[in-house]
């Protein structure tokens, strides 16, 4: 039987990262041309370690949670909408790039639509949404874009970019904390209940990180754990609910047998609020962000259903 180290080596060999398709010079030029506030020293840090943000968050999380482990972090493109952990001597978290880019794109299109419901922006966001659901959600293929298209896509208002990326990092932290919980269990395969327990643990980590940032106990560079994003993990689960809704329009009903549904995962997280959300939390703004997010999801669902009925969705889907 293969050891966890051998499994990881094989997994990494057959699932190369997509990040290395780009040269350092291309990344540098892209960031400097798109983000006016980009600082050369920050980009130099990025060039030295592409995953320095992930590693900084992980280090902060381990310290706050007093976890006596030294996990490694890997980003690979295995075309799986998940993350996983290999229980090697130093546990290795593998975050699939399909999931990374899907969550980022999902937040950008939803928040962009909330900010601008003009016909032009709606058409762009709707097409991006269908592509996200069909290409990445169903076919598990990352979309590819030209350099010019990437620059165009990044011309979002700064507040939308900041909100989307902060929501992404909170969601990323939730997913990683979920995986770390599995390390404490010696079972070969995680159970249905263990998945829910992992969610519960991960959400307590999010609350602790938000509390720590309020108290000045997190690095200033990691200014992403805001009270108004305390519901980010639930926003992330909206993508999987939307994917199920989309597939149901085409007669494909989702079945959850060995793994809890996104609805159940949300329900269990909501059940934690009375006990785990501190009284000192200002939840008003966070509830507002979440409700605004849900309004856009409802609008997208209405448009998906409408365009399926008139045949337009099939045309968009095929292009």
Q: How should these model regions be labeled?
A:
Residues 191-210:
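An active-site-proximal "capping" alpha-helix that borders the catalytic cofactor pocket
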Residues 94-95, 194, 256-260:
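Preference for well-ordered, secondary-structure-rich cores of eukaryotic proteins
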Residues 174-187, 199:
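Active-site recognition of the HExxH zinc-binding catalytic motif
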Residues 105, 187-188, 204, 208, ...:
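Hydrophobic alpha-helical membrane-insertion segments
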Residues 1-171, 185, 281, 287-319:
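Hydrophobic or amphipathic, alpha-helical segments that drive membrane association/targeting
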Residues 207-319:
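Long, well-structured alpha-helical subdomains associated
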Residues 165-174, 194-196, 219-233:
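Alpha-helical scaffolds flanking conserved acidic
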């Amino acid at each position: 039987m293969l050891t966890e180290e051998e499994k990881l080596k094989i997994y990494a060999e057959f699932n190369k990262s997509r990040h290395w398709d780009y040269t350092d010079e291309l990344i540098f030029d892209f960031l400097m041309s798109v983000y006016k506030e980009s600082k050369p020293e920050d980009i130099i840090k990025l060039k030295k370690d592409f995953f320095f943000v992930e590693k900084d968050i992980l280090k902060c999380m381990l310290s706050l949670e007093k976890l006596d482990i030294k996990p490694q972090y890997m980003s690979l493109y295995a075309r799986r909408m998940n993350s996983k952990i290999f229980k090697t001597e130093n546990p290795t978290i593998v975050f699939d790039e399909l999931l990374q880019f899907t969550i980022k794109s999902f937040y950008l299109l939803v928040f962009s639509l909330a900010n601008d419901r003009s016909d032009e922006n709606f058409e762009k966001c709707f097409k991006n949404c269908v592509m996200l659901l069909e290409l990445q959600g169903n076919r598990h293929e990352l979309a590819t874009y030209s350099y010019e298209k990437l620059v165009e896509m990044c011309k979002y208002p700064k507040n939308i970019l900041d909100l989307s990326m902060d929501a992404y990092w909170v969601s990323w932290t939730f997913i990683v904390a979920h995986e770390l919980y599995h390390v404490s269990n010696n079972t070969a395969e995680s159970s249905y209940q263990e998945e829910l327990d992992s969610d519960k643990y991960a959400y307590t980590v999010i609350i602790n990180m938000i509390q720590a940032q309020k108290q000045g106990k997190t690095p200033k560079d990691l200014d992403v754990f805001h009270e108004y994003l305390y519901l980010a993990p639930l926003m992330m689960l909206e993508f999987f609910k939307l994917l199920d809704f989309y597939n149901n329009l085409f007669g494909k009903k989702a079945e959850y047998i060995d793994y809890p549904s996104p609805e159940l995962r949300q329900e269990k997280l909501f059940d934690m609020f009375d006990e785990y959300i501190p009284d000192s939390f200002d939840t008003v703004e966070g509830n507002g962000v979440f409700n605004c997010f849900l309004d856009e999801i409802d609008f997208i669902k209405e448009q998906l259903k409408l365009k399926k009925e008139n045949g337009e969705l099939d045309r968009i889907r095929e292009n």
